[in-house]
């Protein structure tokens, strides 16, 4: 993911089938780079419990206009995201500033902190997740923790700094090693964090 300067502010850029789009969480659009009239409404994405799906039609470089109740045509590409806000935390914060200027007072900042693949995350026992210290929209569920070679950890996609989806890991099983953008990151390097994580792992086994 790159940061590209625009006339308004720097915004992250993602690619859909090779076409770059700005992620603008303030106005809730994906905006084609170089063609600002072509916009994808983020609310057109299907929201599920653990991810969002965007059905992308490369022939029009926009969201698929057909029914989502049936399997899509072969040319439609389905992209999974954890959160658009996590791509553009500055824009998401700007939107909340307009709606509720006091929103920051509800943010939890007195929690244990651990490092996950080079970034700092709060350990939120109440919500059972890790929440990135510098990006409150980037959260990782305790349920995503796996045990590999007797080590608790997470498969992290470095492009999003969140967990790799199962289909991404399935695609990697045919490779001799994980692709460069996916790493196994050990977790739990603090007593309080370790206790919360291990308790959740025991509950998941029941």
Describe every region a protein language model picked out.
Residues 1-206:
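Gram-negative host-targeted secretion-system effectors, predominantly Type III and Type IV
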């Amino acid at each position: 993911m790159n940061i590209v300067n625009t006339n308004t502010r720097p915004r992250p850029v993602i690619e859909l089938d090779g076409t770059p789009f700005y992620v603008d969480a303030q106005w809730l659009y994906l905006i084609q780079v170089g063609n600002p009239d072509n916009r994808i409404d983020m609310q057109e994405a299907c929201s599920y419990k653990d991810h969002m799906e965007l059905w992308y039609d490369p022939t029009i470089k926009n969201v698929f206009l057909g029914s989502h109740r049936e399997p899509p045509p072969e040319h439609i590409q389905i992209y999974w995201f954890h959160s658009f806000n996590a791509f553009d935390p500055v824009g998401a914060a700007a939107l909340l500033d307009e709606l509720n200027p006091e929103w920051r007072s509800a943010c939890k900042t007195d929690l244990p902190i651990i490092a996950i693949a080079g970034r700092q995350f709060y350990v939120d026992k109440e919500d059972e997740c890790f929440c990135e210290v510098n990006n409150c929209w980037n959260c990782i569920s305790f349920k995503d923790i796996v045990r590999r070679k007797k080590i608790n950890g997470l498969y992290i996609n470095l492009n999003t700094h969140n967990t790799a989806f199962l289909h991404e890991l399935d695609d990697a099983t045919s490779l001799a090693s994980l692709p460069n953008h996916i790493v196994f990151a050990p977790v739990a390097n603090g007593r309080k964090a370790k206790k919360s994580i291990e308790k959740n792992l025991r509950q998941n086994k029941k």
